[in-house]
Amino acid sequence: ARHNMAQAAATMQAMQDGSLEKELREANAAALDWLGEEDGWEIRHAATCRLTAEQRRLMAFAAPLLIYNDEAVDAVESEVLPETYRAQLQSWWNITDRDSTLGIVQWLLHEGHHADADAALALMCGGQPDAGDPEEKAEDVQLIAEFMIENGYCRAETLPQTAIAWDLVRIANLGRWALHAGYLSEEEMWQVMQVAADAAREYFSSWEEYGRSFAFGRGVWHGDEEDCQTAWEIVSALLEEETSPWRQIPWNA
């Protein structure tokens, strides 16, 4: 693992001058032009939005997974059956009630899947990790960091410094899922979303930074480049499309 970290650090240094990433970005753009535009990810909206401006802002922090699950970005309502939510929450996180829901919120906030990734990232970039096990996710962090730079998702100097947005997006969605499972009240759901929003504002200064960290964390989660690519496609739609809550709601609103 230490060899992997040294190799990753060397790779990062080699990419600092920007020539390789520029060449790869141009090749990628040319390929997309040749292939033509794809249908892409749809940003769905409720026929009638019943949310306040503040509620819409909080929902925006959940947007990447709402789009991934083909749900409206401005509606609490869901077509999924409550028993489906209950089964999924128990399968994913052993959530069965209010207390276990709030326990997972705290776990995602303070550890989740970002702690080990952040430790590996800090070591790879020449720093010292504050927590987590850097060797646990070293290979996955190197793989996804190189993938994001090579594909023009970021430059070496704008590589995310944390994978926490992956866990924060899940916190924001968990609040809503737990509401529909019958474990949280609507007021508690908004409080959980506020936890995600407050943490996001602490770590990031823009929707772009938040989205880039989400894509990085999603990829590192299973060390899967396709997961990272899918996440970045969704993030790109949120950053670029006029109907996106990320275009309509300022980061510091």
Pin down the residues of each PLM region.
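Polar/charged low-complexity regulatory segments
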Residues: 2-186, 193-253
